[in-house]
């Protein structure tokens, strides 16, 4: 189904954050079913599923940017119109806000039971274990660069019909 690209980015980013923040909340908050259950495997698998579903939903309509860094990287590389950037940024921002809010509302009773502020914060964002602004910035820069580089590389691949053996 093709939809408006801004709506697609909004829905895709909402889906991404709802699943992503939701699984982190489910693993880390008090009295949840998955509390303490091999968090790294569960969180990684669920975030991978969240990305897959979000890209699947939005790829035909908006290109599945789902992240302002991807939108900016594609615009800088000349693969995306600058006139669409502000709308994509807004759709992604509001989608992220709605997805996070929906995850919060889903687990609101568990948030109320959880007293550790770092665990609560960790359901919505990451933070450095060691605060060093230079190293923390460099780490985020490299991670974002690799994400955008991967998306740009994938955008160069032309998928053709499979070769038939006959």
Model-derived segments and spans:
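Membrane-interface helix-loop junctions and terminal tails of multi-pass membrane proteins
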Residues: 1-160, 164
């Amino acid at each position: 189904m093709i939809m408006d690209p801004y709506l697609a980015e909004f829905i895709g980013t909402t889906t991404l954050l709802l699943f992503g923040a939701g699984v982190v909340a489910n693993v880390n908050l008090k009295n949840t079913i998955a509390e303490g259950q091999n968090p790294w495997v569960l969180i990684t698998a669920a975030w991978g599923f969240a990305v897959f579903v979000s890209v699947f939903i939005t790829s035909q309509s908006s290109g599945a940017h789902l992240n302002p860094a991807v939108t900016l990287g594609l615009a800088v590389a000349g693969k995306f119109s600058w006139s669409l950037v502000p709308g994509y940024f807004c759709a992604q921002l509001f989608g992220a806000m709605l997805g996070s809010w929906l995850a919060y509302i889903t687990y609101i009773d568990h948030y109320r039971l959880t007293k550790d502020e770092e665990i609560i914060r960790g359901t919505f964002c990451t933070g450095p274990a060691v605060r060093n602004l230079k190293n923390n910035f460099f780490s985020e820069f490299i991670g974002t660069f690799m994400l955008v580089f991967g998306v740009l590389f994938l955008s160069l691949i032309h998928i053709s019909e499979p070769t038939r053996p006959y």
